[in-house]
């Protein structure tokens, strides 16, 4: 008998909106897939390192109650897993008798710091003294929890990395959702400026701003926006905008011709392949990106509206110089900029909410069909 998701309750677990980029993704995602299901119930968490052991246990109990409240055989659990998202991970650990899927935001592992409670996060030596030497153990723990489940990555390179580490799992790749945002001025009518956008943390490349500024001509302005950017230092040719939402966010993207994504290695544990929420956000505003080829960014190209700089073994100064040259080659060329705008438009449609819902709907339907056949 064909699977009809409208007969199912979706139990959704993820960080609340504003709790890191994954929380923003979660808010867009759950609203996008809601029409697929008969019912959607949620358990939203705080960000990594913000919750106590008691709170983690509370989330686990709440998820169990949400599962029990659904019709037997008609409940599906989906979680958003990120490097330190302990509450989501431990909420799905050990669940039996109910199908569970998860989106892995920092592949190949869903979680890298399974003990990152508030106490552990507040003590750097404890945090890494515990997790770094126990990397093989944490990988085995995740293999026990998720090794034979269906996992979704937001890039093909991410999906391949999961399959290499957890060969028994079923892995799908669905591109990062691109949300609807207002249509702004054409790229060629915007000021000659580039933006840095996103949450400030290790690996996002905000430390490259000063180097890139030195390499750019004076008539190209850098504007910086996002959570945590208010603590950064501006200067001549560098405008710190700070956190933006709503109309302020619209205005920020309307003031730049491209967004720079100079990602590098996020942590020293292993290579990871996260998709970029900042790329998706830029594309939502029909704004191309200039980026490095770190992680999942390597999959992008001009047909997706991205000018990708292959950095190889370049040092930080060389990376900044290469990015600056790419920036100028794009924002100084109206014809090329307009062409990138057309590519962004096509990529937006391919990764829109409806296309994302269709892709996840297929993954869930196929998984539930396999589950029914195996029973």
Segments predicted by a language model, with ranges:
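Short N-terminal targeting/anchoring amphipathic segment
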Residues: 65-87, 99-105
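Helix-loop-beta element that forms the nucleotide-linked donor phosphate-binding surface
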Residues: 143-150, 159-178
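Conserved donor-binding/catalytic core segment of Leloir-type glycosyltransferases
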Residues: 185-204, 210-213
């Amino acid at each position: 008998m064909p699977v009809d998701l409208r007969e199912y309750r979706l139990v959704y677990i993820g960080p609340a909106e504003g709790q890191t980029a994954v929380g923003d993704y979660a808010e867009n995602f759950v609203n996008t897939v809601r029409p697929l299901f008969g019912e959607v119930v949620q358990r939203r968490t705080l960000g990594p390192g913000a919750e106590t052991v008691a709170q983690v246990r509370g989330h686990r109990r709440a998820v169990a109650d949400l599962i029990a409240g659904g019709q037997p055989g008609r409940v599906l659990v989906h979680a958003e897993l990120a490097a330190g998202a302990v509450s989501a991970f431990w909420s799905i650990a050990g669940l039996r008798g109910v199908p569970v899927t998860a989106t892995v935001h920092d592949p190949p592992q869903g979680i890298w710091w399974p003990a990152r409670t508030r106490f552990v996060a507040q003590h750097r030596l404890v945090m890494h003294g515990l997790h770094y030497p126990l990397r093989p153990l944490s990988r085995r723990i995740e293999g026990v929890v998720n090794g034979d489940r269906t996992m979704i990555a937001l890039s093909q390179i991410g999906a391949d990395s999961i399959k290499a580490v957890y060969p028994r799992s079923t892995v799908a790749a669905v591109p990062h959702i691109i949300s609807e945002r207002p249509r702004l001025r054409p790229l060629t009518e915007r000021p000659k400026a580039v933006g840095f956008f996103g949450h400030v943390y290790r690996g996002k490349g905000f430390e490259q701003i000063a180097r890139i500024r030195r390499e750019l001509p004076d008539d190209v302005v850098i504007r910086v926006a996002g959570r945590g950017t208010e603590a950064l230092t501006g200067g001549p040719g560098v405008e710190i905008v700070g956190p933006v939402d709503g109309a302020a966010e619209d205005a920020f993207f309307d003031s730049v011709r491209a967004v720079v994504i100079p990602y590098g290695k996020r942590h020293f544990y292993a290579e990871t392949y996260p998709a970029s929420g900042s790329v998706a956000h830029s594309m939502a505003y029909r704004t191309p990106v200039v980026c490095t080829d770190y992680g999942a960014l390597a999959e992008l190209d001009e047909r997706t509206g991205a000018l990708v700089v292959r950095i190889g073994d370049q040092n930080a100064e060389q990376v900044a110089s290469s990015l600056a040259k790419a920036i100028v080659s794009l924002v100084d060329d109206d014809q090329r900029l307009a062409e990138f705008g057309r590519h962004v438009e096509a990529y937006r449609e391919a990764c829109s909410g409806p296309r994302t819902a269709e892709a996840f709907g297929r993954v869930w339907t196929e998984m539930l069909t396999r589950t029914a056949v195996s029973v």
